[in-house]
Amino acid sequence: MLTMDDIVREGHPALREVATEVTFPLSDEEKKLGREMLEFLINSQDEELAEKYGLRGGVGIAAPQLAVTKRFLAIHVHDEKDRLYSYVLYNPKIRSHSVQQACLSGGEGCLSVDREVPGYVVRSERVTIDAFDENGTPLKLRFKGYPAIVIQHEIDHLNGIMFYDHINKENPSYLPPDVDVFG
């Protein structure tokens, strides 16, 4: 079982590397780690388990956050209609994104960042993702709103980008016009 001790923190070189694609068939280790990443997210959202194991609540995690510079991630997040998006995705790529932008009202956080970083992180409100499941089956997934923000945050990790890289340095509270704000 993964715990917070397994997650590398900002400053670790794996968080700034561009991760390499996995090849199929996946190794047993890659499959196991993907499943453990999803299990971590599920456990972190369970109040009792989170307290028992000292887990910070998370909705997404990428392999580089575990010092594994390979292109896979897990998300476990509900949208505003309580629809669950629960996936382990290998070699995810953003196929298309909306012109309409969105952000979270309270900014973003990260399991690898142990401090609050104020500021808006403006992202696409909708994205279409191409990816593979653990068996190498191609997937085409659409995300909107909060789940779209989460998946973009995790794909950024695969490209060595941290959420705060997107924050306006001169004015962190600057919000461009016509950005939809969630939360």
Curated annotation (Swiss-Prot):
Cofactor(s) of this protein: Fe(2+)
What the entry lists under CDD domains is as follows: Pep_deformylase
Q: List the active site.
A: E154
- Keywords, alphabetical: Hydrolase, Iron, Metal-binding, Protein biosynthesis
Per the record's keyword annotation, is Metal-binding included, yes or no? Answer: yes
Q: Which GO terms describe its biological process?
A: co-translational protein modification; translation
From the UniProt record, which GO molecular function terms apply?
A: metal ion binding; peptide deformylase activity
Q: Which reaction does it catalyse?
A: N-terminal N-formyl-L-methionyl-[peptide] + H2O = N-terminal L-methionyl-[peptide] + formate
Q: How is the cofactor bound?
A: Binds 1 Fe(2+) ion.
**Root EC class:** hydrolase
Residues bound to Fe cation? C110, H153, H157
The record's annotation in PANTHER family points to: PEPTIDE DEFORMYLASE (PTHR10458), PEPTIDE DEFORMYLASE 2 (PTHR10458:SF8)
Instruction: Give the protein's biological function.
Output: Removes the formyl group from the N-terminal Met of newly synthesized proteins. Requires at least a dipeptide for an efficient rate of reaction. N-terminal L-methionine is a prerequisite for activity but the enzyme has broad specificity at other positions.
Q: Which family does it belong to?
A: Belongs to the polypeptide deformylase family.
| Name listed for the protein in its UniProt record | Peptide deformylase
